[in-house]
């Protein structure tokens, strides 16, 4: 069974074709600059160098058409015809309260995804364009929607309701939704499998740390709490996002700087985080380099980032009533030896003991805890595409 996984952005598209017999990625690719001058596809067949396909792509339909043509191309293709593709799994960022699991796409589901546009105005329209383009080009192929928010729908009300007038929740569905759900679910399941513990009491804190970062508190495979909120702006300090702050700061800055709501939102989403503090970059690698070279603001940015992660870990340990495993994943979580060490330092009171030698790995599934550590510290590479493919396969079987 071959599953095509599609992740559509506003001007980009990532894809993978996975043979589910042995979970083998046959091909992966990235389409860039859709609807912009200089559009191109970087198409990478397993065991071969990447091929660059440079063609004009005015919209997502044309982009997907070229991707499908590349998949059956006699030189760099991997299937003889579209009939070999059993189903398509689409990443959808926001499923609101309606979708608490992955679903087969039909008219009712499409209407539900469109209703969530208000909650994810940057992402859901792009996801919808990808789905509609695929449906037009592959009308007989089953399609599945896998939602970033679905995994977090098991949170109890006390963890998702904001202390605002309740009517805003009733009228506008303003509440915590959380994101990166597919990644949190993948690594928590992998942790359970690695430690051979699938009990209803297995307590995991998953740290998805990248340019966008979030934590989740998970008990018995179900999400209890997560750090992102109504939008991906809440929670941890990120590449360019502020994370948690005093809400009264917003009107204060808006008055001082004469900013509109949109301009203020742009400051919080695009100019803040470690980029705002350091003034160096939004890329943690650049900031780590600058800090090593003696840049004090770069060092401060890293200190603030790690301190916030530690605070959340301790808070989630309290919510779960203890913790069995602490998982690091995504770009920083999988690859930054120094930041993992910095985050774990000071968590010894929780039973977290990181082994400095075992921690010297990048992007490899590793138990990096000391033998004496009560809490297992795991580094687990995330694989959202595989999770999407697994959900898709389960629904079309």
Swiss-Prot record:
Pathway: Metabolic intermediate biosynthesis; acetyl-CoA biosynthesis; acetyl-CoA from acetate: step 1/2
Cofactor remark: Mg(2+). Can also accept Mn(2+).
Record's keyword terms, sorted: ATP-binding, Cytoplasm, Kinase, Magnesium, Metal-binding, Nucleotide-binding, Transferase
GO cellular component terms listed in the entry, alphabetical order: cytoplasm
Keyword DNA repair: no
Catalytic reaction annotation: acetate + ATP = acetyl phosphate + ADP
GO biological process: acetate metabolic process; acetyl-CoA biosynthetic process
Binding site for Mg(2+): 7, 384
One Pfam family from the record: Acetate_kinase
UniProt entry tagged with the keyword Magnesium: yes
Main location per the UniProt record: cytoplasm
Annotated CDD domains: ASKHA_NBD_AcK_PK
Localization terms from the record: Cytoplasm
Annotated site (Transition state stabilizer): 180, 241
Catalytic residues (UniProt): 148
Binding site for substrate: 91
Family according to the record: Belongs to the acetokinase family.
Record HAMAP family: Acetate_kinase
Function: Catalyzes the formation of acetyl phosphate from acetate and ATP. Can also catalyze the reverse reaction.
Record text on subunit structure and interactions: Homodimer.
Protein name from the UniProt record: Acetate kinase
């Amino acid at each position: 069974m071959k599953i095509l996984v599609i992740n559509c952005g506003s001007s980009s598209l990532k894809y993978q074709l996975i043979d589910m017999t042995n979970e083998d990625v046959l091909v992966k690719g990235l389409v860039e600059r859709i609807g912009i001058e200089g559009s191109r596809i970087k198409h990478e067949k397993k065991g071969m160098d990447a091929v660059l396909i440079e063609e004009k792509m005015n919209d997502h339909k044309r982009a997907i058409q070229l991707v499908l043509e590349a998949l059956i191309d006699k030189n760099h293709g991997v299937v003889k015809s579209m009939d070999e593709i059993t189903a398509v799994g689409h990443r959808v960022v926001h499923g609101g309260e309606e979708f608490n699991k992955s679903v087969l796409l039909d008219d009712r589901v499409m209407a539900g995804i469109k209703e969530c546009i208000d909650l994810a105005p940057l992402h859901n329209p792009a996801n919808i364009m990808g789905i509609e383009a695929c449906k037009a080009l592959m009308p007989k192929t089953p399609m599945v929607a896998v939602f970033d928010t679905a995994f977090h729908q098991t949170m109890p009300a006390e963890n998702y309701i904001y202390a605002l007038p309740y009517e805003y929740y009733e009228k506008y569905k303003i509440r915590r939704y959380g994101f990166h759900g597919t990644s949190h679910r993948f690594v928590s399941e992998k942790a359970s499998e690695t430690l051979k513990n699938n009990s209803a009491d297995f307590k995991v804190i998953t740290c998805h740390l990248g340019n966008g970062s979030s934590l989740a508190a998970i008990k018995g495979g179900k999400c209890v709490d997560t750090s992102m909120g109504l939008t991906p702006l809440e929670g941890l300090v990120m590449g360019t996002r502020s994370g948690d702050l005093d809400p009264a700061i917003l009107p204060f800055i808006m008055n001082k700087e004469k900013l509109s709501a949109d301009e203020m939102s742009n400051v919080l989403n695009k100019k803040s985080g470690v980029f705002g503090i350091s003034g160096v970059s939004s890329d943690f690698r650049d900031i780590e380099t600058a800090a090593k070279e003696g840049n004090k603001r770069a060092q401060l940015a890293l200190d603030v980032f790690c301190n916030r992660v530690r605070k959340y870990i301790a808070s989630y340990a309290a919510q779960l009533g203890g913790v069995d495993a602490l998982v690091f994943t995504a770009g920083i979580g999988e690859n930054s030896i120094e930041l993992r060490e910095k985050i774990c330092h000071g968590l010894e009171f929780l039973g977290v003991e990181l082994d400095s030698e075992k921690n010297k790995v990048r992007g490899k599934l590793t138990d990096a805890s000391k033998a004496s550590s009560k809490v297992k510290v795991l580094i687990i590479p995330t694989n959202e595409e595989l999770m999407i493919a697994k959900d898709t396969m389960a629904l079309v079987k």
